[in-house]
């Protein structure tokens, strides 16, 4: 086993380098997804029925169709529909962010609904604008309540980002596939990729627990 590791050390490094690509997609997508999710969640709790219908329709579309289909439409069909050819990176980030936003919106909506309505009514009685009530009072509390769920969404994105290899992006999965073809050995490269994904997830979970404890103390 040791001789095998030494022999394939350069290829192991080649696979591990894909971790940065996977992280890049996941972090950017989850940040954009959080922004989209917040906007959708605000629409869902809004009294305007048009905004609620739009937000619910958006969520149903992106939760009701596979991420792979969404990625394929954005990358392959966009040039024919809107005459724009997205790069692999842009197509990946857009599809991941739009998909993540749908799930995050439901999480944030649930978090907003857990906040005592009396706080909103008290703020309105003080003539505080609704935008500031949501931004400074409701959302900060909701985010604290749903932090573990947001971390789970980041973890899901890290694992689901493997489908970007379908478009030839040199992420963890794609690099493992290349090494598998070159060495005629599928088990070892895929094992290395699986270990990288696992370490990433465990590391994020560990950091999230530390942050969560500090949030509880504060």
UniProtKB/Swiss-Prot annotation:
It is found in: Cell inner membrane. Residues 19-208 form the ABC transmembrane type-1 domain. Its main location: membrane. The chain crosses the membrane at residues 25-45, 57-79, 86-108, 187-207. GO terms for biological process: amino acid transport. GO terms for cellular component: ATP-binding cassette (ABC) transporter complex. It is a multi-pass membrane protein. Part of the binding-protein-dependent transport system for glutamine; probably responsible for the translocation of the substrate across the membrane. This is Putative glutamine transport system permease protein GlnP. The lineage of its organism: Bacteria, Pseudomonadati, Pseudomonadota, Alphaproteobacteria, Rickettsiales.
